[in-house]
């Protein structure tokens, strides 16, 4: 059995509609492993100006001004992604970006994240700080400019924060561990969809202790066909409507997938995961060191259901022209 005092993190990622959720569901069938519902992706770390970017900024940036603005950005992003407002919470509904992470993390995402970020503050002082206008509302900027015009500029002074840069990795992982315990206090392993993208895993490997990554690749013909199906539903997948745009986007993304030699990284093909399931399952078990964990059959992973997502493109003859284009331009990525 795994040591429940040693937390393992698994990131399962792909190129969009890659079938990664099936792999995450399989991983979640092992004893002591937490995995999310398909509707939950924790983007707070990976998005532009998210926590990974902020931690890199804090570790490497010399300019205190840039660090201060980055700090204020990440506080705002955390609030917007974390708040789970009631219908009567006007401020929360105004700012919310709809991820509602507080709901998923036992109502503690905002508390834990703010406690972590504010614990990094070493000192602060007040000063005129026009650079903050780039991250505040136009209305607030207008009011400040008006106050300056009528010689009330002292009211526009901002808090400028000086941050502590020591032991950042230790502090980050202590915070992350606290977050994980709010998902499930009894699990020893936590699997996420898209904690990091597959293009540059260096930030994931640099900041998260005891982490492994699985990148799931899928035949682009099936991705395109699946996207077209979604485009006819309320879950339209942005950017896949046009075959030319799809080819350009897929080629750019697929060519950028991290394929460096690293024992923390495993690349699997979705079609092989389905058609040669037992062998691929063994690869995953060995990679994650799950040999001694019990596999619990559940409705979470359903091989027969997942198998319906192989050769999807063959069911749509009306896409033949587009499929031929994909076969020509993306021949190196076909399964």
What are these regions (language model features)?
Residues 44, 225-226, 275, 313-315:
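Generic structural "secondary-structure junction" signal
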């Amino acid at each position: 059995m795994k040591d429940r005092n040693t937390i393992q993190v698994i990131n399962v990622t792909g190129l969009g509609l890659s079938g990664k959720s099936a792999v995450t569901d399989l991983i979640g069938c092992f004893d002591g492993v937490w995995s999310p519902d398909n509707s939950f992706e924790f983007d707070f770390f990976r998005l532009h100006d998210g926590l990974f970017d902020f931690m890199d900024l804090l570790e490497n940036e010399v300019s205190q001004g840039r660090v201060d603005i980055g700090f204020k950005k990440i506080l705002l992003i955390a609030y917007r992604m974390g708040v789970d407002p009631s219908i009567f919470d006007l401020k929360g509904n105004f700012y919310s970006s709809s991820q509602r992470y507080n709901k998923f993390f036992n109502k503690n995402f905002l508390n834990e994240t703010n406690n972590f970020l504010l614990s990094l503050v070493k000192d602060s002082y007040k000063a005129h700080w026009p650079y903050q206008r780039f991250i505040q509302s136009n209305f607030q900027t207008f009011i400040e400019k008006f106050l300056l015009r009528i010689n009330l500029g002292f009211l526009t002074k901002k808090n400028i924060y000086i941050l502590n840069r020591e032991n950042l990795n230790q502090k980050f992982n202590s915070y992350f561990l606290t977050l994980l315990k709010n998902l499930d206090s009894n699990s020893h392993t936590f699997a996420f969809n898209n904690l990091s993208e597959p293009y540059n895993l260096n930030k994931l490997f640099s900041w998260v202790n005891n982490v492994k990554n699985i990148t799931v690749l899928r035949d682009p013909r099936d991705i395109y066909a699946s996207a077209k199906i979604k485009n006819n539903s309320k879950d339209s997948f942005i950017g896949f409507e046009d075959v030319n745009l799809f080819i350009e986007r897929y080629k750019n993304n697929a060519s950028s997938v991290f394929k460096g030699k690293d024992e923390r990284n495993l690349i699997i093909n979705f079609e092989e995961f389905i058609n040669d399931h037992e062998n691929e399952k063994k690869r995953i078990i060995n990679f994650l060191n799950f040999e001694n964990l019990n596999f619990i059959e559940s409705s979470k992973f359903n091989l027969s259901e997942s198998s319906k997502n192989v050769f999807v493109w063959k069911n749509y003859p009306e896409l033949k022209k587009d499929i031929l284009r994909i076969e020509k331009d993306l021949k190196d990525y076909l399964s």
